[in-house]
Design a protein with these regions (language model features):
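Serine-hydrolase catalytic core recognition
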Residues: 1-107
């Protein structure tokens, strides 16, 4: 994140991924803030990946599952640090994308 807090996230490559090509990317944001992603199967991610998109999903501050301090990290500041976490995740993914995963101009 912007202030150095580590935030968990996942980046799914498109089907038939070719590292020499660039791909559009979708940032999938969960509802909440009292919610979280975990390791699971999601038809929407699979659908986007099957149609040539990279898919990024994360648990920004305010998400459950990481302790009460993490949940309270957005108290009196919504949106704020949660938004910063999402954008930092996009930046981190974009750094990966520059190595051939996706087109940084189509996010």
């Amino acid at each position: 994140s912007k202030d150095g807090l580590k935030v968990q996230g996942w980046l799914m490559k498109p089907a038939n991924f070719d590292p020499s090509k660039k791909y559009p990317m979708v940032l999938w944001i969960h509802g909440g803030p009292w919610s979280m992603y975990s390791v699971n199967w999601n038809w929407a991610y699979q659908n986007f990946a099957a149609n040539g998109y990279a898919v990024l999903w994360t648990n920004p501050r305010g998400s459950t599952g990481y302790g009460q301090d993490f949940v309270n990290g957005i108290q009196h500041s919504y949106p704020g640090k949660d938004y910063d976490d999402l954008m930092a995740s996009v930046d981190a993914a974009r750094d990966t994308l520059h190595r051939g995963l996706a087109d940084a101009l189509i996010l």
